Amino acid sequence: MESEDATLTKKVELRPLVGLTRGLHPADLEKLTIDAIRAHRRLVEKADELFQALPESYKSGKEVGGPQHLCYIEASIEMHAQMSAVSTLISILGYIPNATVN
């Protein structure tokens, strides 16, 4: 029979978080998860603002590259990476905590 950790690591995106959070009190894990959700929300807003500021030719994909476009891409990478952390923390926690708007 597989251990609980082995089963969990098969279901999560960022397996190192399983080890990093092992043994944490549930309240601490919930706080980490809520903070990660809030950070993700900020990153979504930032990426959206940068996308909205792009010229239409970039939004439509007719043009690519350049400093402004790269800033948007970097923000999107950060946002998606944070979403992986959020998803993993929610899997470890076992539920989606109530993360009120900050």
UniProtKB/Swiss-Prot annotation:
InterPro entries: Tscrpt_rep_TraM, Tscrpt_rep_TraM_sf. The keyword Aminoacyl-tRNA synthetase does not apply. Pfam families: Prok-TraM. GO terms for biological process: negative regulation of DNA-templated transcription. It comes from the Bacteria. The keyword Cell membrane does not apply. Keywords: Conjugation, Plasmid, Repressor, Transcription, Transcription regulation. Disulfide bonds: none annotated. Negatively regulates conjugation and the expression of tra genes by antagonizing TraR/AAI-dependent activation. TraM may either bind or modify TraR or AAI making them unavailable. Alternatively, TraM may bind tra promoters preventing TraR activation. This is Transcriptional repressor TraM. It comes from Agrobacterium fabrum (strain C58 / ATCC 33970). The lineage of its organism: Bacteria, Pseudomonadati, Pseudomonadota, Alphaproteobacteria, Hyphomicrobiales. The gene is traM.
